[in-house]
């Protein structure tokens, strides 16, 4: 279905018995995360918290809590996405089977981002960071965190949405030394597009403009975690997966996703860091406090009746397990084309997905060698370690 909002998706899930509403007041300090965790553990439905203590906004979680539910959300477009990836792997398929792939090519063209749409619901009102549900997931967390953010940045040398990056990098909203409502923490690791953008901005002594989107059509959230080739924009992918073009405007020089439920805009200043964390992470342990980039908040926008999406990470399996399964279904066949010599890969969920990847490769180039020693396999391993979300 072509959802135009997070709420449209949640109403569809509810209509099919895949969501329940929690009308009682729930505390964002540990209680919401605990409810989410217990429901996820038993394969339960998506959750809509209608009465969040200390906030006038509703919150939703466990949206992608099972692979079956994720497939249901994207039931009309998954096959099209898989065909698009097939075409990327083997463009000659469009020549050999033109009628089979004609619709896929047209869908990709129609999915290009749309600037300045007539409706801009996210600009309904300006709010403060402290108005957002301040969800504290684990007892030793350093503050409230955004766990389903879509963090947007642009290349200052090649500005524009088609050269932009959309990634899921955790955001700390409160705690530590952050000035309330004026500063937030931005945490990202190696091989992330935003790092390239910040490096270029730092070299020029310029601040990097960053926008953090939350909510909106569920395809936007998935696009932020997809390991996409550099030539495919996350926003175009979101348009294909969601069967609806990514809509955006520029406001005060910042990109704003008009279909998002919330948007935080701000600047990352060169060389300015603050302690971020601790945070109960994917491995079931706390990632400790370290210096990470500081984002100075410019504006915070919210649509009418906005819904704050969140998840809880920790010792696997968790909701991000379903993300990994969905991504593997869509992209698994692409890996052998991207990395020659690789036959199959498997990210081990029990290890937290990122730390352990199993790969089956081949030794093709030294059949004359009397003793088989890893050679091509080492090349493959280094290729994997340097490949975006596989690393």
Task: Describe every region a protein language model picked out.
Residues 1-294, 298-391:
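Extended, highly charged
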């Amino acid at each position: 279905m072509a959802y135009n909002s997070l709420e449209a998706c949640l109403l569809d899930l509810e209509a099919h018995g895949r969501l329940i509403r929690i009308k009682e007041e729930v505390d964002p300090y540990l209680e919401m995360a605990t409810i989410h965790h217990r429901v996820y553990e038993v394969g339960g439905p998506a959750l809509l918290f209608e009465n969040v203590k200390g906030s006038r906004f509703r919150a939703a979680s466990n949206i992608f809590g099972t692979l079956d539910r994720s497939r249901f959300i994207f039931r009309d477009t998954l096959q099209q996405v898989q065909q698009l990836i097939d075409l990327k792997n083997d463009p000659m398929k469009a020549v050999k089977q033109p009628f089979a792939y004609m619709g896929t090519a047209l869908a990709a063209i129609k999915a290009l981002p749309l600037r300045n749409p007539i409706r801009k619901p996210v600009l309904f009102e300006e709010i403060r960071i402290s108005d957002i549900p301040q969800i504290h997931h684990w007892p030793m967390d350093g503050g409230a965190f955004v766990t389903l953010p879509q963090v947007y940045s642009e290349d200052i040398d090649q500005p524009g949405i088609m050269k932009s990056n959309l990634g899921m990098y955790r955001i700390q909203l409160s705690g530590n030394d952050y000035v309330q409502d004026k500063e937030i923490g931005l945490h990202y690791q190696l091989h992330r597009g935003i790092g390239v953008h910040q490096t270029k901005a730092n070299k020029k002594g310029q601040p990097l403009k960053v926008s953090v989107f939350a909510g909106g059509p569920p395809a936007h959230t998935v696009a932020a975690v997809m390991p996409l080739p550099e030539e495919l924009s996350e926003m175009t992918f979101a348009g294909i997966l969601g069967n609806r073009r990514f809509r955006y405007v520029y406001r005060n020089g910042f990109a704003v996703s008009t279909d998002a439920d919330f948007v935080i805009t701000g600047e990352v200043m060169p060389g300015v860091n603050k302690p971020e964390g601790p945070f109960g992470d994917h491995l079931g342990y706390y990632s400790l406090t370290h210096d990470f980039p500081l984002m100075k908040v410019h504006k915070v926008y919210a649509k009418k009746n906005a819904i704050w999406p969140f998840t809880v990470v920790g010792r696997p399996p968790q909701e991000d397990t379903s993300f990994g399964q969905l991504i593997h279904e869509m992209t698994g066949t692409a890996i052998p084309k991207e990395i020659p010599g690789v036959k199959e890969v498997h990210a081990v969920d029990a290890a937290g997905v990122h730390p352990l990847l199993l790969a089956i490769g081949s030794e093709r180039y030294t059949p004359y060698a009397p003793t088989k020693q890893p050679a091509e396999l080492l090349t493959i391993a280094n290729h994997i370690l340097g490949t975006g979300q596989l690393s």
